[in-house]
């Protein structure tokens, strides 16, 4: 169903699982598996390999890989389009 996965670190997982409305930023991404285009639905996987949820990509996989791990970049998944399990 979901061709692509975005893997996130512990800190990103904790923030996403908090009560705050927060977008998935590139700084919290550790790996990207598969390719996706902007607006594709991607699965979000935590540091232990568990599915955290799904979201609509704000960019394509190439742009996400370039921004991965960096500060001050646009969200890869905006919180309005983030569905947590």
Would you name each region that the model predicts?
Residues 3-85:
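Beta-strand/loop-dominated core regions that host nucleotide or nucleotide-derived cofactor-binding catalytic loops
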């Amino acid at each position: 169903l979901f061709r692509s996965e975005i893997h996130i670190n512990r800190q990103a997982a904790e923030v996403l699982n908090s009560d705050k409305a927060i977008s998935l930023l590139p700084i919290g991404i550790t790996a990207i598996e598969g390719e996706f285009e902007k607006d594709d639905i991607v699965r979000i996987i935590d540091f232990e390999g568990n599915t955290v949820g799904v979201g609509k990509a704000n960019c394509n996989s190439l742009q996400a890989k370039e921004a991965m791990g960096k500060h001050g970049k646009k969200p890869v998944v905006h919180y309005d389009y983030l569905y947590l399990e």
